[in-house]
Amino acid sequence: MALRAGLVLGFHTLMTLLSPQEAGATKADHMGSYGPAFYQSYGASGQFTHEFDEEQLFSVDLKKSEAVWRLPEFGDFARFDPQGGLAGIAAIKAHLDILVERSNRSRAINVPPRVTVLPKSRVELGQPNILICIVDNIFPPVINITWLRNGQTVTEGVAQTSFYSQPDHLFRKFHYLPFVPSAEDVYDCQVEHWGLDAPLLRHWELQVPIPPPDAMETLVCALGLAIGLVGFLVGTVLIIMGTYVSSVPR
């Protein structure tokens, strides 16, 4: 699905510094942030994020209206009412017009994303694995990511993360595809974004070692046989010489 242009985007971030080293210092042992939270007019979507030391703990998606923990284990020791995140998104939405006027209606630059595809673990034929499509350098956070197998769209088992913020105020996103490696299948991660002139395809296929040709196999066998014959002849000669020497009277 092609992306249509037209977006109003608002951001909000609240930082919390823990254990500052000295009065007025900007450095801290740890840093937590409620945000970045954003709302965008394109598709009426938004996200509220809580981070600790620049690592996302959870996010609240406007459409899902629920807190999604980056790792399920995080939800075992902490709780968060998603209404708090939704309220933050609503506040940004309510002030979008003001933000647009203050920016003098200047449009942000669409940044081309970078795409990398790699397997989760060592690939073995016939053994289930997961392909990971890492898309970073995203801005604005509006993107379409599609998996293709042999040129055909794949949706079964596909999973994705929310947008992860980066220190440079860009975003990162991960897409996952369960698959069973086969020498016949090839995969592509297709990315559509306003920073790209055309959909970007990042290719992946299993690299199967090429066996040596028949001529090479024949040469290897011939060399092995020749070495064996030479060893046999040398051994025979040594035995004969040893027998002759032992039979000579001293």
From Swiss-Prot:
GO terms for biological process: adaptive immune response; antigen processing and presentation of exogenous peptide antigen via MHC class II; negative regulation of antigen processing and presentation of peptide antigen via MHC class II; peptide antigen assembly with MHC class II protein complex; positive regulation of immune response; positive regulation of T cell activation; regulation of T cell differentiation. Residues 241-250 are cytoplasmic. GO terms for molecular function: MHC class II protein complex binding; MHC class II receptor activity; peptide antigen binding. Residues 1-25 form the signal peptide. It comes from the Eukaryota. SMART domains: IGc1, MHC_II_alpha. Keywords: Adaptive immunity, Disulfide bond, Endosome, Glycoprotein, Immunity, Lysosome, Membrane, MHC II, Signal, Transmembrane, Transmembrane helix. Residues 205-217 are annotated as: Connecting peptide. Changing residue 99 to V: In allele DOA*01:03. Glycans are attached at residues 104, 144. Residues 113-205 form the Ig-like C1-type domain. SUPFAM superfamilies: Immunoglobulin, MHC antigen-recognition domain. The chain crosses the membrane at residues 218-240. Residues 26-217 are extracellular. GO terms for cellular component: late endosome membrane; lysosomal membrane; MHC class II protein complex; plasma membrane. Residues 111-204 are annotated as: Alpha-2. Residues 26-110 are annotated as: Alpha-1. InterPro entries: Ig-like_dom, Ig-like_dom_sf, Ig-like_fold, Ig/MHC_CS, Ig_C1-set, MHC/Immunoglobulin, MHC_I/II-like_Ag-recog, MHC_II_a/b_N. It is a single-pass type I membrane protein. It is found in: Endosome membrane; Lysosome membrane. Heterodimer of an alpha chain (DOA) and a beta chain (DOB). Forms a heterotetrameric complex with an HLA-DM molecule during intracellular transport in endosomal/lysosomal compartments in B-cells. Belongs to the MHC class II family. Important modulator in the HLA class II restricted antigen presentation pathway by interaction with the HLA-DM molecule in B-cells. Modifies peptide exchange activity of HLA-DM. PANTHER family: HLA CLASS II HISTOCOMPATIBILITY ANTIGEN, DO ALPHA CHAIN (PTHR19944:SF44), MHC CLASS II-RELATED (PTHR19944). This is HLA class II histocompatibility antigen, DO alpha chain.
